[in-house]
Amino acid sequence: DNGEAPVAGFDLTTRQPKSISILWAFGDKETRDGIDECMRKAAEMTIDYFENEYATTRAGQGGVASVAADGVAGFAFDHYDSRDGDPQPHKHLVISNRVRRSSDKMWTALDGRKIYASMVEISEVHENLLQDLLTERFGWTWTLKQDTGTKAMVNEIDGVPQELIDAFSGRHAEIAKEVERKIKEEEQQTGKEVGPRRKAQIDLEVWKKTRKAKPEIQPSLKAKRDHWFRKLGEVAPGIQIDQMLKDVNSRKTRLLHVDAECEDDIARLLLGQLADLTQLAGGGDEYLDRQARADIQKTVNAHTVWKRTNVRAEAERLLREVRIDPTQRVIVANAIADKALGQCVKLTPDRYKLPDGALDDLSIATRQGQNVFEDADLDQYTTADVLEAEQYMIASLDKTTGIGYKPGQGNQWLDQWNERMKAQGGYPLAPDQQQAAAYALESPCLVSSIIGPAGTGKTTTMKAVSQAWQARY
């Protein structure tokens, strides 16, 4: 017990593009029932993947071994709308933290390290599986569009008017607008672009701040649908639902599918079909190489060190526009991820090797055929470029340069900056802040740093440093 509150379980919440919600809310019974069935099946397939890949527990002194568990237990709760009352069918998959260890049948807890790390990948897998299942059932086609109010790309069903998507995305629009405002505000204060991790933090902060309370008495689903149809008449009176459904169902596509006896060949054969279908030059190997390179580049843009799950999540995003047989989906995505990881530098050393004939011994072997003391899901990777940049940075600590402000010039510029701040009603630098800023501006070193605890004014200090540097260079 380290003093932290115990974790009873995990709430995995599904999501889908708004066009699916629109068709579910306003479609005929056959359409609604079909979407419900696809959502149920996508949730089941996602949990199966989660169980097979990440639902493990720990054993040994200090939990040194990551060992297999006999699946997970939980409940699925269906919700039908957003906090703003817009149609948004989704499921809360509440997974118990208690699992039975396969090796000795003792009841233990899930390995939370892997649960938290894999959540983005699990979400991406579910989103792709749902779209695959809907295409399998209805033949619907999809187009990747920029989400209104954000830079995110969303795969929407062709034929669903953007007017409807926007009209029934009230909470999403509210969050997106506030997130954009806070990002711009922070970038103006710091003088630099907000990174992906900070954007995610801002998004979560805004989501919590704008979250409305649920009504004490939930309306029935029929009452909700009546409300949606009334709102439809108010916000989009010119849209005819029957015509929309005809437009949606008039567009048909097919899934990529391969029948193969040997599972090892499926990814290669399927990628060959995929390369042909998307009119890409070359065969499966060339496509796999290109997607692997793209996968790594996107991962590097967001991380300097990553795990396999980060690369798998990016592979799922790369394949967002491609509809694949749902039973083969993760095989294709993970084949790209494995190829990408082969181009990485593994930072976690290999220390143990399973003895011959030990693959079935769950006390020392995982279901994936690895030893329990070296969990591949926890291995860390980077690239040679990142390592070279790290070495360059370290070497730069001992280098000097001729650029920057001469001794005394930095302080003079900061004095003028303080006067401008006072005149504008802003906050000038305190003496210790100005001393730190002058040090950064006048230091002959190629790399220098300012260190201070939270709340001591580092952001304001660096704002002055940034403006001083931009004024000269």
Language model regions located:
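Helicase P-loop NTPase motor core of nucleic-acid translocases
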Residues: 1-473
